Amino acid sequence: MSFEKFFNTAVSSWMSQEGPDSDIVLSSRIRLARNIVDFQFPTVFNNEEAQQIVSLFEQTFAHRFYPSVGRFELLKMSELQPIEKRVLVEKHLISPHLAEDSPFGACLLSENEEISIMINEEDHIRIQCLFPGLQLTEALKVANELDDWIEEHVNYAFDEKLGYLTSCPTNVGTGMRASVMMHLPALVLTQQINRIIPAINQLGLVVRGTYGEGSEALGNIFQISNQITLGKSEEDIVEDLKSVVQQLIAQERMARETLVKTLNIQLEDRVFRSYGILANSRVIESKEAAQCLSDVRLGIDLGYIKNISRNILNELMILTQPGFLQQYAGGVLRPEERDVRRAALIRERLKMEERKAMEGDE
């Protein structure tokens, strides 16, 4: 497979499209946890019940068309290769738990990959909407519309006092998790992030790494989400999160301005050194690649680097993960082989940008 063909089929819309404040906010996600009456929760149900739930969603929703997102395809975890499941995790379309610990798990995936509905994860279903930039309100609107569409066909486990019933008590109520992924290199470089994260936690929000709980903030990418689901409306939860995110955006922009004023030539040097590493390396580990990509993205946003899309960070942070590298290679790779393949893929992607720039100048 040629790189361009691989790239065009691998990239989801949230990676390649721009959204509001997408210089700092990479994506917005809304996730709704729901369970169906007359079935035990996934934490205690048996294999027969698990299969019945998958069959119910396969018969009712697979290949159905939904406006703006296209048709849904059902992917059964038992029918996917380990690399295929890993790619879905790396694209943020399913959770590691569904990929690794749910033999009767499945996922309904929309054509544009903005919508994924996980089946038999921690709850019977988890509806996820993933949009580029800061679009929490828009993602919530689509998630609620999908939620209503599904509820026309199934009965949810719901309590008048508590709200939606979920396997984990922390999700009871709205059953909603709202989150954003943010690129905050200037707050990291100025070390302001060390005081900001505890302050955010005190507001009932959680700050995690790129792939959620327990993951590292590779490439200065942080995931910020709500913790409280009970006693607040979905709209209030989203507005509270948006308010904090908008403050973070302002602080990151101020920190960038400070860096440009005080360390302009050193910052420019850092950006171009990182670009040189990405453009010329023959071997590169994931952590170094993530840091260099973060530097280059910052350089693009500050105008140091021209004619390269800022979405290159979104794309390459995903495409250089182990699952994608092995899918591109067409087989399992040892860690040292992945480092070679990662360097080659990054060089190819940068060459694509150079060709686009040259064609644009003609």
From Swiss-Prot:
Highest taxon of source: Bacteria
Keywords: Allosteric enzyme, ATP-binding, Kinase, Nucleotide-binding, Transferase
Motif RDXXRA motif of the pArg binding pocket involved in allosteric regulation, chain ranges: 338-343
GO molecular function: ATP binding; creatine kinase activity; protein kinase activity
Activity regulation text: Appears to be allosterically activated by the binding of pArg-containing polypeptides to the pArg-binding pocket localized in the C-terminal domain of McsB.
Keyword DNA damage on entry: no
Binding-site positions, ATP: 27-31, 92, 126, 177-181, 208-213
Phosphagen kinase C-terminal domain boundaries: 24-255
GO cellular component entries: extracellular space
Keyword set includes ATP-binding: yes
Record-listed E.C. numbers: 2.7.14.1
EC class name: transferase
Record's catalysed reaction(s): L-arginyl-[protein] + ATP = N(omega)-phospho-L-arginyl-[protein] + ADP + H(+)
Coiled-coil regions, chain positions: none
A Pfam family recorded for this sequence: ATP-gua_Ptrans
Biological process annotations from GO: phosphocreatine biosynthetic process
Function noted in UniProt: Catalyzes the specific phosphorylation of arginine residues in a large number of proteins. Is part of the bacterial stress response system. Protein arginine phosphorylation has a physiologically important role and is involved in the regulation of many critical cellular processes, such as protein homeostasis, motility, competence, and stringent and stress responses, by regulating gene expression and protein activity.
Family: Belongs to the ATP:guanido phosphotransferase family.
NCBIfam families assigned to the protein according to its UniProt record, in alphabetical order: PRK01059.1-4, PRK01059.1-5
HAMAP family in the record: Prot_Arg_kinase
Protein's name in the database: Protein-arginine kinase
Species in which this protein is naturally found: Geobacillus sp. (strain WCH70)
GN (gene name): mcsB
